[in-house]
Amino acid sequence: MDKGGARRRFVREERDMADYADMHAFLMRELRLMHEPVGIRFFFEAEELEEFRGRGVHVEPVRPLTFCQAELGARMEGRVVLLDMKKLWCTDARCVFGVDAVSEGVVRDLLRFGTGEAQVRRFVESKPCMERAPLAVLLSPLRAQEGMPDVVHFCCDNMQAYHLVDDWMAVSGVHPFRPSLSINSAVCGGTAFSYLHTQANMTLACAGSYNSGKMERGEINVMIPGAHLEGMVSRMKERVEKTGGISLTRQGQPFPGADICQNCPVIVFKKPGERAGR
């Protein structure tokens, strides 16, 4: 047994976990996130999946769940959730992850989203679709990541999403930003798109993510490729160090998107004894 190799791998994973824990803490604190960022990793090889299972660091759904429901364990409860595709209940997610082909039943269920069967079929068949179906998907709080996730999902408000996407555009060089939203596939389809194209994505809640995914506060979904996360966070950290705050809308402000007009003469804060004009 290569004990040296195992030790090197352990040290690397330990370092990676520390790095992601730091990024997690920074994002939660500076962006004022309510939901934990979720690292998404797809397992395609049975050997790799069984090796992970054998470590016993995860939980699994007792009953079949939608992708959005399974993610709640990571996003709201801070748990490491392994979702086997055999327990993936949502037909839309099963299609975009390449587990099932588009069926007549799927089209019929979505007729309300179009003007007729032909149009809805075209809509469904044009959704992002992974060519190779994963065996399982791991959903973890970013702080618990061991190595780079495939995609990182943020459930956030308008201005938090604005900062994430703006900083992603800056580090990727992509502009304008063109998100991809598919009918009834906000989180699953949005994640598949980000994975397939190595591109950030932003989606509104669909019926499934709004109800099953508990997004009743009007949250917005942002997906960032795992390979781009470190550069994006580094840019944010540099801005905080240089200006004193993460805000892009009001430079130097600690709140992302402070709702105060720049020239407002009313909302001004000074130390006691300082004159307002100074």
For the regions a protein language model found, what residue spans apply to each?
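Acidic, serine/proline-rich low-complexity intrinsically disordered regions
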Residues: F10-D16, Y20-R278
